[in-house]
């Protein structure tokens, strides 16, 4: 089984982070993509689900809201809300 740190690094490398806009459903899965193609790999999708589950309760706008994901490798990703600009780092 892949350890969390290795999986996290693989996730960041594989994801087309720059200028990616994504809509999440809290605790479920990504339900919308804007100019983004997600690699369908087993090591990546669990991280997406985990991201939804952990991060989305921090926002009060509810499902269907758009968020902006950025990553400056090797530093970790950040997530910000398009409406209130709330900003969280993983």
From Swiss-Prot:
Name assigned to this protein: Putative transcript Y 12 protein
Superkingdom of the organism of origin: Eukaryota
